[in-house]
């Protein structure tokens, strides 16, 4: 059986396709389209008709691929940008009518809860799973038998547009204070993945991360593209996404 997921995010629309059996699931293919919904939402409060038409066109393209690849089932979810736009329900209804498929707008806490479905998330103590998106950051921590989840209105695009708020940083700091035995951060999301791939690494020590992040921050956007091969919509936002990881690393005193 083939299944697919579609994530309407703040910085891009992404899809992953999997082959499943009763006992296994295997990743087959992925698609990414750089539609930055968050720019309109965080600047003007709502998604424009033009951007909605662009989104619909992208989703229809995905649907054609699903038909061609004989996908048996797929789900479309939307996160920070669609839940924060002032025309959220109107936008969802418009998209659903155009693509003839339901869209589920999930809360930040639901996003954080979904991290718990990671195969290792409920087996590894003292590790923080951190998903930094374009509009929000979700954290999942498992300390047997306690599960802790939280969502914060801090994300790469939000920071880039200077729409983050001091009280949200304070809320993050206060929440992290309760954890004094976290030994490792598992980073999820496009920014940390691109950063590690750029250095041909799967993991790194916190000191090394902070040093390499500082070096990256000092580069111009074109330099990041030329040196690391980042896409335009990754090169301009990656510093801001990594800034959130930097804050969490320091607050949790990760070595």
Model-predicted segments: where are they?
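Short, glycine/acidic-enriched loop or turn micro-motifs at the edges of active sites
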Residues: 10, 134
